[in-house]
Regions:
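Gly/Ser-rich "nucleophile elbow"/oxyanion-hole loop immediately N-terminal to the catalytic nucleophile
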Residues: 112
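Basic/polar, cationic surfaces and motifs that engage anionic cell-wall
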Residues: 1-90, 115-121, 127-208
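Alpha-helix N-cap and loop-to-helix initiation/capping positions
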Residues: 94-98, 163-164
């Protein structure tokens, strides 16, 4: 596992001051609901041939474009993950760059006109490699669960039908201890949140 700070993945600053919050030893588990197993043929093509779409999140601000860009980035990430699992060894730099691009995409979407939040919703973003990315600073209020935004929000980049990797699970437990989180539940277990998040597979893997 490697932990990447906001400066390392290229975070934009919050649009306003974030409210302080104590997690009280509590965490809330989410998934991105973006299938990392999505087939490339089902994804829209880049608007310009050969264009690096994951560099355009800040310039293409409409919610529909942001969603398409995130889907493309996750599809590209899935190809690299499949190869990495076959090859083994260290996580290649290209895979890390994909992860950073996806996190930037999440932040751009969350701060954009569709959501209008001050910053990325979650405090921690976890990938199949076990790498974790700093989202909102710990000790600030998130935007991830009604009535529970004071808790530390963990987002696993996976969707319904995906199985979390062992690296994901191990990294989550290692990080939550560092974050002072002793008790955690799934998003759907928080009162007032009508959702299937974080999905059946992650719910089972974490015994939620």
């Amino acid at each position: 596992m490697k932990f990447y700070t906001r400066s390392e993945w290229g975070a934009a600053p919050p649009s306003d001051d974030l409210s302080p919050a104590s997690n009280g030893g509590q965490g809330t588990v989410h998934y991105s609901a973006s299938r990392i197993t999505a087939r490339a043929k089902n994804m829209p093509k880049p608007e310009k041939p050969g264009e690096k779409w994951y560099r355009l999140w800040r310039n293409k601000a409409t919610p529909a474009v942001q969603r398409r860009n995130i889907s493309r980035a996750i599809t590209d990430y899935n190809r690299k993950i499949a190869l990495w699992k076959k090859m083994g060894g260290e996580v290649p730099p290209a895979l890390v760059e994909n992860e950073k691009a996806i996190v930037r995409g999440f932040q751009a979407f969350h701060q954009g006109p569709s959501r209008g939040w001050l910053d990325i919703a979650y405090h921690r973003i976890i990938f199949a490699t076990g790498n974790i990315y700093e989202g909102r600073p710990l000790g600030t209020t998130g935007a991830h669960a009604v009535g529970a935004n004071h808790t530390t929000g963990y987002c696993f980049v996976m969707g319904e039908g995906d199985e979390p990797t062992g690296q994901m699970i191990d990294s989550f437990h290692e990080q939550r201890v560092k974050d002072g989180v002793r008790h955690y539940v799934g998003h759907r277990q928080r009162p007032g949140n009508s959702t299937s998040c974080p999905g059946a597979a992650l719910t089972a893997a974490l015994d939620l």
